[in-house]
Regions:
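Bimodal "functional hotspot" detector
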Residues: 1-155
């Protein structure tokens, strides 16, 4: 009888819902090709507002939703701190980041790129400095990549 009874719920409800979540892009490694592959993920905005860099790296440590992808970050790695200074994120990781890494230059580069590409998706970030247990100048076991440099996104 009354067409108004069929009206869909007010628009605000979806907007509230959308405001609570945000789409982030995380970079994982394709298990077969070993290439870096982006994966979109909806996450709680609250986490992005309180600890954006730590939140994103912790998501990178977890396994991706897509079964063809895998985390580029070594198992057991913990984020000890993440702080923006200027436009560079100082990312402090636990020793497992070095100790548990599978090694090999390609795998090491993929690990660095996964972190850098994920964090530089945020407008305020142009580079990442990696610390291990608060210390600079650490390196992977292969010694191909030293962490003394600030890593920037390679297009």
């Amino acid at each position: 009888k009354n067409a108004e009874n069929n009206v869909i719920q007010p628009q605000e409800e979806t907007t509230d819902e959308q405001m609570r979540t945000a789409l982030v892009t995380l970079y994982y490694v394709n298990k077969e090709t070993k290439e870096l592959t982006p994966e979109g993920r909806m996450i709680d905005v609250k986490n992005l507002l309180t600890d954006p860099y730590e939140t994103l790296v912790n998501l990178l440590i977890e396994q991706p939703k897509n079964e063809k992808l895998q985390s580029a970050i070594p198992t057991g790695t913990k984020v000890l701190g993440a702080e923006l200074k200027g436009d560079v994120v100082y990312l402090d990781l636990s020793n497992e980041f070095i100790e548990n890494h599978e090694g090999g230059e390609k795998a090491e580069q993929a690990t660095i790129k996964a972190i850098v590409n994920t964090l530089t998706e945020l407008n305020e970030v142009s580079g990442v400095k990696i610390l291990i247990n608060g210390q600079e100048n650490k390196e992977f076991k292969d010694r191909k990549i030293n962490f003394k440099d600030t890593f920037t996104r390679i297009k």
